[in-house]
Amino acid sequence: MDKLTDLNYTLNVITLLNSTLHTILEDPGMAYFPYIASVLTVLFTLHKASIPTMKIALRTSKCSYKVIKYCIVTIFNTLLKLAGYKEQITTKDEIEKQMDRVVKEMRRHLEMIDKLTTREIEQVELLKRIYDKLMIRATDEIDMTKEINQKNVKTLEEWENGKNPYESKEVTAAM
């Protein structure tokens, strides 16, 4: 029944607004009609939307001050947007949240920079070791046996019993 009464009240207010606006329209000197109509519509919408919302929020919320502050900031931001401003009103909580987000992002960037510098230092050390190993050393005699893979090659005199291990042998197998 309460909702029906509220609906009737809303319809009566809309009818009153329409009749008022029609009487204003008949006056030919009224040049600001669209602006007045927009302001009245916004005020009526805010009135109808904010009062039930505030009642519910105050009943369910533990901290009514924060709810009221949030609702007022939202209403002012809406009015600023309707007026064409791009700036918004922010509360201290929102500013602290943004500052925390910025600080967290800066910490993440610092950690990334630290990791990158550590990797670069390791790469420089690795390049130094590679350079040290590649340095040309002066020697009197160059051992070419490593280059032609003859370090483990035996001559005929070094073979066991003087036999060539690569010659084929006769193998007998039992059937």
From Swiss-Prot:
Q: Which residues form a coiled coil?
A: none
> Which residues participate in Ca(2+) binding?
120, 123
Q: How is it modified after translation?
A: The N-glycosyl content is primarily Man(9)GlcNAc, with a small amount of Man(8)GlcNAc.
**Keywords from the UniProt entry:** Activation of host autophagy by virus, Calcium, Enterotoxin, Glycoprotein, Host endoplasmic reticulum, Host membrane, Host-virus interaction, Ion channel, Ion transport, Membrane, Metal-binding, Secreted, Signal-anchor, Toxin, Transmembrane, Transmembrane helix, Transport, Viral ion channel, Virulence
The cysteines covalently paired via disulfide bonds are none
Localization, per the record, is:
Host rough endoplasmic reticulum membrane; Host membrane, Host caveola; Secreted
Write out the transmembrane intervals: 29-51
Its GO CC terms are: extracellular region; host caveola; host cell rough endoplasmic reticulum membrane; membrane
**What's a single GO BP term from this record?**
symbiont-mediated activation of host autophagy
Q: Which residues lie on this side of the membrane: Lumenal?
A: 1-28
Those parts of the protein on the Cytoplasmic side are 52-175
GO MF terms on file? channel activity; metal ion binding; toxin activity
Functional note: Plays an essential role in the virus replication cycle by acting as a viroporin. Creates a pore in the host endoplasmic reticulum and as a consequence releases Ca(2+) in the cytoplasm of infected cell. In turn, high levels of cytoplasmic calcium trigger membrane trafficking and transport of viral ER-associated proteins to viroplasms, sites of viral genome replication and immature particle assembly. The secreted form acts as an enterotoxin that causes phospholipase C-dependent elevation of the intracellular calcium concentration in host intestinal mucosa cells. Increased concentration of intracellular calcium disrupts the cytoskeleton and the tight junctions, raising the paracellular permeability. Potentiates chloride ion secretion through a calcium ion-dependent signaling pathway, inducing age-dependent diarrhea.
Q: What family is this protein classified in?
A: Belongs to the rotavirus NSP4 family.
Q: How does it assemble?
A: Homotetramer. Interacts with the immature particle in the viroplasm. Interacts with host CAV1, early and late in infection. Interacts with host integrin ITGA1/ITGB1 heterodimer. Interacts with host integrin ITGA2/ITGB1 heterodimer. Interaction with microtubules blocks trafficking to the Golgi apparatus.
Question: This protein is called what?
Answer: Non-structural glycoprotein 4
Origin species, per record, is: Rotavirus A (isolate RVA/Equine/United Kingdom/H2/1976/G3P4[12])
